[in-house]
Each structure stands twice: as C-alpha cells, then as structure tokens.
Amino acid sequence: MPTWLTTIFSVVIVLAIFLYFGLLIYQKIRQIRGKKKDKKEIERKESNK
C-alpha cells in the first residue's frame, strides 16, 4: 500500500473516533438538559396545585 493511502486511512479513522465520542458526549448533554427541563415542568405543575 502506498504511504499516502495509509495516511488517508489513519486520518479517516481518527476523525471517525472523534465524531463517535463527540456524538456520545452530545447525547449525554442533551439527556442532562432534558432532565433539567422535566424537573422544571414538574415543579411548575406542583406549584399550580
């Protein structure tokens, strides 16, 4: 295999790993934000009673 091919493959693999971890972190942040919103909605419902 030529060297430029191996460099392209390695760059693609590194980018894929970064994207994978980025998506995982992004989903966790969204879940945390969603939970905070749920808590606020529950507090509003309780205060309305």
UniProtKB/Swiss-Prot annotation:
Keywords (A to Z) from UniProt: Host membrane, Membrane, Transmembrane, Transmembrane helix
Ranges annotated as spanning the membrane: 5-25
GO CC list: host cell membrane; membrane
Location within or outside the cell: Host membrane
A Pfam entry, by short name: TMEMspv1-c74-12
Bilayer topology term: Single-pass membrane protein
The organism's place on the tree of life at top rank: Viruses
Family: Belongs to the plectrovirus ORF12 protein family.
Name listed for the protein in its UniProt record: Uncharacterized protein ORF12
